[in-house]
Amino acid sequence: MSSLFCTMVEKAMGGLALKHGFQVTERGRSLIAFETTKVEMALSYDDQRSFEVGLGLSLKIDPPAQPSHSFDELLRALNVPANEWSTGYAARDVEAAETIVKKMAGILERHAALLLNADPDAWVKLGEQRRSDCIAYAATTKMAHAKRAADEAWVAKDYQKVVAALEAVASELGKADAAKLAYAKRAVSP
């Protein structure tokens, strides 16, 4: 299976790899890695559990600053239209994985040439996308924790805890949760 996957990826990525100077640096059971003097790209296929194809892209720096950027990050940072990538990553077999890898190669060719050629501005933009994603994730997680704590306190009619949970995120609350906070504040006011 692995050699079939690696052979298929080499064929599907061949034109892209040649155009941007990538060489195969690693072939494993279900992983193949390419690199230039400045960029690393790895494709993997989990044929044991998730049956998903993965792609990671990273700028070669010493020491490596972060994990490689996922294909999802690339799609967001490059503003790839949804109609170009309307599929997921699951592939029940190597033939289905080949379809996914070919789509990935096409998107990289059309949208990621600057990244593949190690353009500093393109990599800064990709890094900014990751930071933006992290900030959004942290805000979403903070809100979810606050709402969960407030909901538990609400059921217990512990309005002091409702206020404590929601006050930190008050500016981000929707109408219903803002009303819940206002009610809880009135309930604990002397």
Task: Give the residues covered by each predicted segment.
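Intrinsically disordered, low-complexity regulatory regions enriched in serine/threonine/proline
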Residues: 1-12, 24-190
